Swiss-Prot record:
Ranges for region Interaction with RAB38: 451-600
Gene (name only): ANKRD27
Modification type Phosphoserine: residues: S962, S970
Protein name as catalogued: Ankyrin repeat domain-containing protein 27
Keywords: ANK repeat, Cell membrane, Cytoplasmic vesicle, Endosome, GTPase activation, Guanine-nucleotide releasing factor, Lysosome, Membrane, Phosphoprotein, Protein transport, Repeat, Transport
Protein species of origin: Homo sapiens (Human)
């Protein structure tokens, strides 16, 4: 029955029935009857003139059927049994069944039978038409190849052996290998003399190619397609996430015309067979059949000849979304790259191109692009929102309430739900609150029967409550309001879905966290047995999965199955969501549970990449179990000794084990927080630290927790109250902004390491300690400088982070910045008073590290700020010794030693000028030989700008008050630049002395002191506008402590 198929709309018998007896077609539709249609191959040319059409129309009666002319017919299994009224009691096979609809949407069934009911021949098999130049099944291929397939098997066995050795080769390697196997088998086939003669005919040659390709690919399909699936794993997961979010899509949403929707169910069934095809040729034939089904006319009255490419694309888009094929990208790659028997410039190639266009259209986000939040929910593709919230413009109070909830109109929602004032008015008009007189009864009943009353328990035609609508539309601000009005967080709709189900299905993490906070149950199963976690995994919403799992790991049931027996891990593995899988496995999801098909999550893995992730966690779990097993007691030990030992140490062992479990639990909670910080998940951080909106708004008014200043310890004045409130607040989870992991990393450390510039201010304003050290004695500023995160460094320095602290290796933040070549950070640190000649445990200064790492602009910047080239490291090498000969860095370093003394030498001498006019001129002569780097030019412009007045040593120490501010425009116009210093009351001779020096002054070290009134030392400090410095966040490394910057090359 399933082996034969034909287009009944082109069947001569059915066409004749429609043309000659349209009345019968209308009648059978009205009574929802059955039409018997003989297959095309069994019909003779005289069938229209001799056939009695009434005998082919069946009307159901008790326990059997009757034709319109009163004959009895029985349907037994896959056969038609003819009864009373027929001249010959035949048994006619049923080939297949289809359901048709007329223009009034009345349905009737058509049974395609092997031959007409009047047929007398002994043979009952249909003469099914077939394409003589097409092979559809592997059985057809084996029959065509005959004994040649045995020769192919030896080549294929060899391919299997070599593939295992070259499994990690490139895709092109495997394409070539498979093509070589195909070519070799085809060559063997053409060695047959008979087939060689047939190959001269193009049609026969194409048939041979198809046969070889189908056979070869069928035998190596598991190897090749598994590899392709691994290569396309990330693309498949991304595409699946888009299509899963579009399950509410309707045909009208993408412009599918009604006349094209009749064949969509058949096309969908055919497309679902794609993954059962084991060769590119078979997959293409499947796609072609889908296109053919789409373009078939549902009746003679509907002409589909004018179907354009856009109409076909709309239907294909709908099929791609609604057909559950989780590896579209792998299928496309497989078909395009491993089809060897034909070029793409044929009918099959056109079908493939059409599907590619539809898939690319979905990948671009054209169907899933969401408008900004300000545009409301009307343009979003939600769970039928457009149907009743915006498209149904009714005056129903419930519809009005739901519309305001969907659009986030909190004021109107609160007005509609505020019944307290009305109730108070009603009570005041009553004789007394418990009165049941006639007047009071009328008053109360009138209120109860008021159709305009809406409550948090009102429902629409889907069983949705206001909380359902707020959840499905992502209106987190309305969740608090609805719950405060009495909304039930665990209310279910007609499909058994709670608001938490819908929030997880749509991926709204903030709504999910709020519902969990209000005690929404994460274990409620809908009509399909799915929990909210199942839906979050189905649609790939990793944030919602984390919210559900992290809320309460102890009570979250990760291993509960739905009606198919699938756990959340089954679903995530089937759709290839690696992040979701890792979250589930990290929190104890089992990889050994079987669903109703006896499949474990490992067996459901979409590709080998997902499988390897789960296997790795499975092996690590087994190792942890083995390591946690206690050793067996020695049999030689006496019972008395064991009893005595247990009696004396039972309490201590129990308390120790409980403390150990408590510590492990605490560290698990801390790790969750640190992972959320590393991911930049602000909503999860807020939830774990229990920050409210009020906390964020009041963050500007908070003071540092490291050194709070109160009027007295218990003061609650307006100045001290915010800090007292923050310090007194301890989250129920025990987590705070200064908690640390086992390696000493705090949330601020992790945020600094990963460049989370948006989290740094919030953590600091909530009391994070910028001076906290991890196991390597590194502060957050060390990590930010090591990774080159400018905005993070700037925020930490603005929060008074100390720029000269050293870690375990003796490195300062400046040394890390110089080693990494981050010249913007170097300038920023120097501006905030970083010690320029501080050395690490190897004796290397910042200049050493910059020279070793060959960062010419950093070297130049350090020299301009007075870095000493005379400092020796522990190998007795200066920065000059570390530089390469005849390099640009050596050229920079050679200018300074001839005229710049070290800091100690300057202090011992008669405070001579730090840089002479001669060296300034010598240096400026080489200025334009350097690369044209904007930041470097900036410092040249600064040092050649204006005349400066001298300062006393006290004024030098307050150098942050005398910083010139250069605008970005002035940096690009050196002729117009102006540097403004705050003028101090200095003696006239000092001012004239400084004026005579002009541009010949060189920047001074900040540590110099004044020893005589006759000599003044001037320090120039320069501030760079933030807009000049690159502020883009860099990709952070893994969550780990910083490693010591290598300086071994010195």
């Amino acid at each position: 029955m399933a082996l034969y198929d034909e287009d009944l709309l082109k069947n001569p018998f059915y066409l004749a029935l429609q043309k000659c007896r349209p009345d019968l077609c209308s009648k059978v539709a009205q009574i929802h009857g059955i039409v018997l249609v003989p297959c095309k191959g069994s019909l003779s040319s005289s069938i229209q003139s001799t056939c009695q059409f009434e005998s082919y129309i069946l009307i159901p009666v008790e326990e059997h059927f009757q034709t319109l002319n009163g004959k009895d017919v029985f349907i037994q299994g896959n056969r038609i049994k003819l009864g009373a009224g027929f001249a010959c009691l035949l048994s006619v096979p049923i080939l297949f069944e289809e359901t048709f609809y007329n223009e009034k949407e009345e349905s009737f069934s058509i049974l395609c039978i092997a031959h007409p009911l009047e047929k007398r021949e002994s043979s009952e098999e249909p003469l099914a038409p077939s394409d003589p130049f097409s092979l559809k099944t592997i059985e057809d291929v084996r029959e065509f190849l005959g004994r040649h397939s045995e020769r192919f098997d030896r080549n294929i066995a060899s391919f299997h052996r070599t593939f295992r050795e070259c499994e990690r080769k490139s895709l092109r390697h495997h394409i070539d290998s498979a093509n070589a196997l195909y070519t070799k088998c085809l060559q063997q086939l053409l060695r047959d003399s008979h087939l060689k003669m047939l190959a001269k005919q193009e049609a026969q040659m194409n048939l041979m190619k198809q046969a070889v390709e189908i056979y070869v690919h069928h035998e190596i399909y598991n190897l090749i397609f598994k590899y392709v699936g691994t290569m396309e794993a990330s693309e498949d997961a991304a595409f699946n996430k888009i299509t899963r979010s579009l399950q509410d899509l309707q045909q009208k949403d993408i412009g599918v015309k009604p006349e094209f929707s009749f064949n969509i169910p058949r096309a969908k069934r055919e497309l679902a067979q794609l993954n059962k095809c084991t060769s590119p040729q078979q997959k293409l034939v499947c796609l072609r059949k889908v296109v053919q089904l789409i373009t078939q006319s549902p009746s003679q009255r509907v002409n589909l000849e004018t179907m354009c490419a856009d109409d076909l694309l709309s239907v294909l888009l709908y099929l791609l979304v609604k057909t559950e094929i989780p590896n579209w990208m792998a299928n496309l790659s497989y078909i395009k790259n491993f089809r060897f028997s034909s070029l793409a410039k044929d009918e099959l190639g056109y079908c493939l191109t059409s599907f590619e266009a539809a898939i690319e259209y979905i990948r671009q986000g054209s169907l899933s692009a969401k408008p900004p939040e300000s545009e409301g929910f009307g343009d979003r593709l939600f769970l039928k929102q457009r149907m009743s919230l915006l498209s149904q413009m009714t005056s129903s109070p419930t519809d009005c309430l739901f519309k305001h909830i969907a659009s986030g109109n909190q004021k109107e929602v609160e007005r509609l739900l505020s019944q307290e004032d009305h109730d108070k008015d009603t009570v005041q008009k009553m004789c007394h609150p418990l009165c049941f007189c006639d007047d009071c009864e009328k008053l109360v009943s009138g209120r109860l029967n008021d159709p305009s009353v809406v409550t948090p328990f009102s429902r629409d035609d889907r069983g949705h409550t206001p909380l359902h609508v707020a959840a499905v539309c992502g209106q987190a601000s309305l969740i608090d309001l609805l719950v405060s009005k009495g909304a039930m967080v665990n209310a279910t709709d007609y499909h058994g879905a709670t608001p938490l189900h819908l929030a997880c299905q749509k991926g709204y993490q903030s709504v999910t966290l709020l519902l969990l906070h209000y005690k929404a149950s994460a274990e409620v199963q809908d009509n399909n047995g799915n929990t909210p976690l199942h839906l979050a995994c189905t649609y790939g919403h990793e944030d919602c999965v984390k919210a559900l799992v992290y809320y309460d790991v102890e009570s979250c049931r990760l291993d509960i199955g739905n009606e198919k027996g699938d756990t959340p891990l089954h679903i995530a593995a089937r759709w290839g969501y690696q992040g979701v899988i890792e979250t589930l496995l990290q929190n104890g999801a089992s990889t050994e549970i079987q669903n109703r098909l006896k499949e474990t999550p490992l067996k459901c893995a979409l590709n080998s990449k997902i499988l390897s992730v789960m296997e790795a966690y499975h092996l690590s779990f087994e190792r942890r179990q083995k390591s946690s097993e206690a050793p067996v007691q020695s049999p030689q030990r006496s019972v008395d000794s064991i009893s005595q030992e247990s009696s004396t140490s039972s309490f201590s062992s129990m308390s120790a084990s409980s403390r150990q479990e408590e510590t492990k639990k605490d560290y698990r909670e801390v790790e969750k927080l640190l992972r959320a910080v590393a991911d930049g998940d602000l909503e999860m951080v807020r939830y774990l630290l229990e920050w409210t909106e009020e906390d964020l708004e009041d963050a500007e008014d908070t003071v540092s927790a490291a050194d709070p200043e109160f009027c007295h310890p218990l003061c609650q004045c307006p100045k001290c109250a915010p800090a007292q409130k923050r310090l007194a607040k301890v989250p129920a989870s025990g987590l705070g902004v200064n908690v640390t992991s086992q390696d000493g990393s705090s949330p601020l450390h992790v945020a600094a390491l990963h460049g989370r510039a948006d989290l740094i201010p919030l953590l600091l304003k909530h009391g994070a300690n910028a001076g906290a050290r991890n196991a390597d004695q590194a502060v957050p500023l060390h990590l930010a400088c090591q990774q080159g995160h400018f905005q993070v460094v700037k925020c930490l320095l603005d929060s008074n982070a100390k720029p000269n602290k050293k870690d375990l290796s003796g490195n300062t933040p400046l040394i890390y910045a110089c080693s990494g070549g981050h010249h913007e950070l170097v300038a920023l640190l120097l501006q905030h008073g970083a010690s320029i000649n501080a050395s690490n445990n190897k004796g290397n200064t910042a200049l050493h590290e910059a020279v070793i790492e060959k960062h010419v602009f950093v070297v130049e910047l350090l020299l301009l700020h007075g870095a000493s080239v005379q400092v020796l490291n522990k190998r007795q090498r200066t920065a000059v010794d570390c530089a390469e000969q005849n390099s640009k860095i050596m050229e920079l370093l050679q200018v300074v030693p001839s005229c710049v003394a070290s800091l100690d030498d300057v202090a011992e001498t008669d405070r001579k000028e730090y840089v002479t006019v001669k060296i300034r001129k010598k240096w400026n002569s080489k200025l334009y030989d350097l690369p044209d780097e904007p930041f470097t030019r900036q410092f040249y412009f600064v040092h050649s700008a204006g005349q400066f007045k001298g300062k006393t040593s006290r004024e030098i120490m307050a150098r942050d008050r005398s910083v010139p501010n250069l605008t970005e425009g002035s940096l690009h116009e050196p002729g117009r630049q102006s540097v403004t210093l705050r003028q101090n009351n200095l003696p006239a001779q000092s001012g004239s002395h400084a004026a005579e020096k002009g541009n010949s002054d060189w920047p001074e070290r900040p540590g110099l002191t004044q020893t005589g009134p006759g000599h003044r030392r001037m320090l120039r400090r320069h501030t760079v506008e933030d807009a000049v410095v690159s502020q883009g966040p860099e990709a952070a490394g893994p969550l780990s402590t910083p490693q010591e910057v290598s300086a071994s090359r010195s």
